[in-house]
Amino acid sequence: MTITELWALIPLLILACGSVFVLMLGAIVPGRCGTVIGVAVCAGTALWAMLAPPQPLAPPTLGVTVTPFTRFFLVFFAVTAGLSLLLARDHAARQGLKGEEYPATILFGTFGMGVVASAANFLTLFLGLEALTFAFYILVAYDHNRPASGEAGLKYLLMGAVSAAFVAFGIALLYGATGTLEISRAVAASAAGGGIALAGWGLLLAGLAFKISLAPAHLWTPDIYQGGPTPVVAFLASGSKGAAIALFLLILSPLGTLGTLRAPLWGLAFLSMTVGNLAALLQPNVKRMLAYSSVAQMGYVALALLSGGRGYEAAAFYAVAYGAMVLAAFGALASLEGETPLEQVDDLRGLGYHRPFQGVVLAVAMLALAGIPPTVGFVGKFAIFFAALKGGEAPLAVIGILTAAASAYYYLRVVVNLYMKPADETGSGQRPTVAEALSLGIAALAIFILGIWPGPLFDLAAAILR
């Protein structure tokens, strides 16, 4: 490996070495310094990916290539991980959770996300995907004080194993049909691969549908969101979904035309938008509501992927937008939680007055998820529906617009409970710590800044997909 190649791989090495360092330091010097080091590692990764001179790897080294696409998502993953670490620090202390395994595992999961975004062949892609999934197996089950957390971790493990089997079998069929593990060559040779290649792409799509929670492969999502520690769910909903979107873009954008994959992706988008929103309408549990909401939101991303061209740009934009929105939503919930988690939407009654900062952030997140201007949620949804109309997906775009309008009911129900219903006298929520306030403030500002001034991010999304 040359110095140039090593230089390009430094962001991934920072994350991998940082994870090991935090874990070993926690064993030698127990304390809470892991979060500080973890945030510093994430900041270093993001700064290096943004500011270091471009050193593309061609041909790929170790199955990894570093391109503007890779750098874009590395910055996104590092920022979401850093904000999640800030949220987790004091939340873990309130829940009685100790040890540096928490920040170390978050860093390891971020490393897996970076490997996924920089993968040049299917083997590296699979290893990165399983690295980030393995990290979430641990994180979801980390709260040993709550049986629901262990149950959620077990369910995620089982569903993750099924997903991994689909992905691995799909990769095996593609290798058999095309004779190569390199993604670009496999895409080019797929036309000559016949039915075997088609089956491989179909299995790969099915496995990724599990990862991104597209209906009907979404049934694990509500239990994981409800049972897992809230800061972990924030990271899962932002970073992990962003990695899955990056993976879809990595595979689908070189295809040019989706061909026979269009029909199953159309069905996944339709089911996700309708089933996700209908299920969320009926949910009294706030985390399960947001879980079903995430199914619908990923349905909009699938609609963007169907549209091609501008749709891919809209999907990349929405990965960042959705990350900011769910970090703000789950971050506010995590900040409000004491020794027991907030469960029902009714538990939020009057908290907008008792805890104004968290109330405002949560309300902003709900308005953004509902697609109300001038938030980034409105801009992202507008871009997706516009791309769908331009891309010949008018019927599905109309369905998306109608379901997005219906979703305003359950998002605004949270805002109504925050500000228009009397407070529950049994508790008034936790005050935000400095770390939590910083994380929530950054997420809320991103929602407004990207909603008012989305041009630079759209330009960047277009540039990385050229």
UniProtKB/Swiss-Prot annotation:
Family annotation (InterPro entries): NADH-Q_OxRdtase_suN/2, ND/Mrp_TM
Transmembrane segments: 9-29, 33-53, 68-88, 100-120, 122-142, 157-177, 190-210, 232-252, 263-283, 289-309, 314-334, 359-379, 394-416, 438-458
An annotated GO cellular component: plasma membrane
Superkingdom to which the source organism belongs: Bacteria
One family name in Pfam for this protein: Proton_antipo_M
Signal peptide as annotated in the record: none
Catalyses which reaction(s): a quinone + NADH + 5 H(+)(in) = a quinol + NAD(+) + 4 H(+)(out)
Cell compartment(s), UniProt: Cell inner membrane
Keywords assigned: Cell inner membrane, Cell membrane, Membrane, NAD, Quinone, Translocase, Transmembrane, Transmembrane helix, Transport, Ubiquinone
Catalytic class of the enzyme: translocase
Subunit structure: NDH-1 is composed of 14 different subunits. Subunits NuoA, H, J, K, L, M, N constitute the membrane sector of the complex.
Functional note: NDH-1 shuttles electrons from NADH, via FMN and iron-sulfur (Fe-S) centers, to quinones in the respiratory chain. The immediate electron acceptor for the enzyme in this species is believed to be ubiquinone. Couples the redox reaction to proton translocation (for every two electrons transferred, four hydrogen ions are translocated across the cytoplasmic membrane), and thus conserves the redox energy in a proton gradient.
Protein name stated in the entry: NADH-quinone oxidoreductase subunit N
Taxonomic lineage: Bacteria, Pseudomonadati, Thermodesulfobacteriota, Desulfuromonadia, Geobacterales
